[in-house]
Amino acid sequence: MGRTLESKKQIVEELKALLDQAEMALVIDYQGLTIKEMSDLRTRLGPSSGICKVTKNTLMRKAIDGDTSWSSLESLLNGTNAFVLVKGDVGGALKAVQAFQKETKKSKTKGGLFEGKLLSQDEIKAIANLPTKEVLMAQIAGALNSIATKMAVGINEVPSGLARSLKQHADSGEN
């Protein structure tokens, strides 16, 4: 038995709400995946605030209709699609999807949309390979700390160098 018009409208509204919160959308061909494997993917996406939704392309088309930030997804809406909507850690979600695909070898990423730009396979891989925000912040903090340390050593070296020069001059004057 098919869905009623009312339930379809409710699904479209739910998709619109998810898209409003999402920073990125990833379109995956899920053909051949079992329910258990889809549950595994959803579990993996949890820590990165990603959601995996399987819905008809026509319902997703209605959800993005008139929304310029998501309208580029239109070109990916064919075949059997699962939509990964990420509202948190984009890199973490992409890494989770890639690890899942590597293990199952059953699904492939058709493309994605990030900040209104359609992403190719290579661009998606590049984003997934970026370090996490925490790692980047640690690297920046380390770089700033090393600059401060080098400045302190440099500032301390001026009087020390002067003292060594004076001592050397005084020692040479005694002879």
Curated annotation (Swiss-Prot):
Keywords, in A-Z order: Ribonucleoprotein, Ribosomal protein, RNA-binding, rRNA-binding
UniProt cross-references to Gene3D superfamilies, sorted A to Z: 3.30.70.1730, 6.10.250.290
Pfam families to which the protein is assigned, alphabetical: Ribosomal_L10 (PF00466)
Keyword DNA-binding: no
Keyword RNA-binding belongs to the record: yes
Gene Ontology BP terms: translation
Gene Ontology terms for molecular function: large ribosomal subunit rRNA binding
SUPFAM superfamilies recorded: Ribosomal protein L10-like
Any one GO cellular component localisation term in the record: ribonucleoprotein complex
Entry coiled-coil feature ranges: none
NCBIfam families named in the record: PRK00099.1-1
Record note on quaternary structure: Part of the ribosomal stalk of the 50S ribosomal subunit. The N-terminus interacts with L11 and the large rRNA to form the base of the stalk. The C-terminus forms an elongated spine to which L12 dimers bind in a sequential fashion forming a multimeric L10(L12)X complex.
PANTHER family the UniProt entry points to: 39S RIBOSOMAL PROTEIN L10, MITOCHONDRIAL
Function statement: Forms part of the ribosomal stalk, playing a central role in the interaction of the ribosome with GTP-bound translation factors.
Family membership: Belongs to the universal ribosomal protein uL10 family.
Protein known as: Large ribosomal subunit protein uL10
Encoding gene, per UniProt annotation: rplJ
